[in-house]
Amino acid sequence: MLERLNFIENKYEELSNKISDPSVMANQKEWQKLCKEHADLEIIVNTYREYKKAQEDLESDKEMLKEESDKDLREMAQEEIKELTLKLEDLERELTILLLPKDPNDDKDVFIEIRAGAGGEEAALFASNLLRMYTRYAERKNWKVETMSLNATDIGGFKEVTVAIKGKGAYSRLKYESGVHRVQRVPDTESSGRIHTSTATVAVLPEVDDVDININANDLRIDVYRASGHGGQCVNTTDSAVRITHLPTGLVVTCQDEKSQLKNKEKAMKVLKARLFEAAEAERAASIAEDRKSQVGTGDRSERIRTYNYPQGRITDHRIGLTLYKLETFLDGDIDEVIEALVTEDQAEKMKDLGRVN
């Protein structure tokens, strides 16, 4: 590990010199690429330097203990040795995590697709609850939320809705939300007070660049039609809504949120690219994946990942067996406690995989 850390530190110094070179700065595209690479290495290098400083301090205290006869100074050195030993253990764990293979999509913006599942109108209302939860979470993170497409019901639910969330680290945090979400509650329309179970499916897709995926224009069928609002009523007198069908895969994306047909087409193309990229990544991952007990981070949508139980005020994440009794604040966007636990579990699995490889 130390050999790799020394290599990274040297690379960081090399990049520091390059990004301050006027001849490199003249090429803005190359300069921005180098700046990003430099920023990605910064936390590793700073942690490694802190680790080396702690090691030096530890050796210094050990030398003092050998040579010093003063009782108070010896006690002080012994106390510092204990503290530094613990600090070094913590820093070593931190460095191990920082050196784990990084998901190349972690820095990307995301699309979140929420679809009502089993449960009819109640499932559509739950989809609306999930949309609000992610919107509130994005607000806490100062991320931007943009509606891409929606299919609303008459009483405020969503059969399906897609939003774009833009902000630093959006995919790295939200990727764990892919899967089947289950709600247990008494619907407002239920006179007997019986608890119903409904589901909604969430898909989190990284926004992809044009260089990430290439789409042949001949593979697309683009239809335009008049946008409709709640209950199907027409809200536009021009054919501004767009439906794009990717013929080889059968994937269909619609967008009618904008008044402009061109803007709707641009939005729909972004979502289509993200879906095609996800499908390609899933196929690639499936071909090389090892058997893993946990599905944390894989985005397996066939798996029920979380239950929201209203009568008990409970949220249970089934992937890691974590239960919290804070349903109201959780649905108000306070979801970081669960996400942190999922990140930790994902890191632990990666460390196990690394151990098997080594």
From Swiss-Prot:
Coiled coil: none annotated. It comes from the Bacteria. InterPro entries: PCRF (IPR005139), Pep_chain_release_fac_I (IPR000352), Pep_chain_release_fac_I_sf (IPR045853), Prokaryotic/Mito_RF (IPR050057), RF-1 (IPR004373). Keywords: Cytoplasm, Methylation, Protein biosynthesis. One of its GO terms (cellular component) is cytoplasm. Belongs to the prokaryotic/mitochondrial release factor family. Peptide chain release factor 1 directs the termination of translation in response to the peptide chain termination codons UAG and UAA. NCBIfam families: prfA, PRK00591.1. This is Peptide chain release factor 1. It comes from Clostridium botulinum (strain 657 / Type Ba4). The lineage of its organism: Bacteria, Bacillati, Bacillota, Clostridia, Eubacteriales.
